Amino acid sequence: MNLLQLSLSNLSLSPLSTAVNILLLSLGTGSIAILLIATHLLSAALIRDAADIDLVVGAKGSPLQLVLSGLYHADIPTGNIRLSEARTWMEHPMVESAIPLSLGDSHKGFRIVGTNEDYVDIYDGQLAEGKLPSNLLEIAIGSSVSKATGLSLGATFAGQHGLDGAGHAHDEDSYTVVGIFEASDTVLDRLLIT
């Protein structure tokens, strides 16, 4: 009797134990495969969202919080800095380009970002409908924002302070949706740009 025949004979003696072992091995292997795929997808998304960004400058506070809020828009901002302080960096001879961001308000959990067209260009943002904001209280929204909130061109809404939905609503100032971005699989899909 060779080793293969001996192994098969042993497996056939306890079919329930064999089936449970095969099931557990399959579940373990599947779990590891799912974790590896999820890690790869998350890593690719983080790299894609940080493309072409070398430095994040912001208010005093936690560097991690600054990166999470200013780059990935996944945390509460450390605060805004004065434009005069930002200009020091923006006009520095070693800085090729600088993009200002103003954070703090949201709509239904999606961050409202005050910035300029350069921010959209970093992510190769293309409009599916409408135009980029050019006037006060005009806003262009990401594809995920449009789907989740039901906002469309011409819709108006009031932003609210903070990200958690419990902040003060700015009912006195309503934004008007003037553009909707195409899906880009970047952070731009989850933002409202004004």
Model-predicted regions and their roles:
Residues M1-Q5:
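Short, membrane-interfacial amphipathic segments enriched in basic
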Residues S106-N116, Q126-T194:
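Hydrophobic secondary-structure segments that place a key small or acidic residue at a functional site
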Residues L16-L41, A45-L46:
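Short, strongly hydrophobic transmembrane alpha-helices
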